[in-house]
Amino acid sequence: MTRLWREQNLALVGLRGIFPVWKVASNELIQEFISAKFGSVVCCTNDAYLDESFVGKTIDADFVASLPADVDPCGENGEFHSFAFAGPIFKESVKFQVGEKVYRPLEETHPAVASTVCPAPGARRTKGFWFCDLLPA
């Protein structure tokens, strides 16, 4: 998604976007995130990029090193989503445990959905997503 798209959609609801890390390299951002002692866990992966084994992993240096070369270390292209549970801005860490992992295939019955998951020739194709439950500890 482009910055213009975001600005236009925010304007529709009377908001103005501020983008302090726009165009900062993801490799730099993830190293800063890890160095600052933030804790984050992967709660969803796009199966076109990452398999079930990545769901439930803590984002740390080992996680970043294990990513395929074409996966953004911050998940900026939709490769994965995460939940931040600890860090210097948290009053206290969120206690949780990783629960069940489930796979949800995409249902391409609506033209609007199908058009968003049909990549350019040669690009990876998303068939579904892996999720994990994050349960109170």
Residue ranges and their predicted role:
Residues 1-137:
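Nucleotide-activated chemistry modules centered on ATP-dependent adenylation/adenylyltransferase
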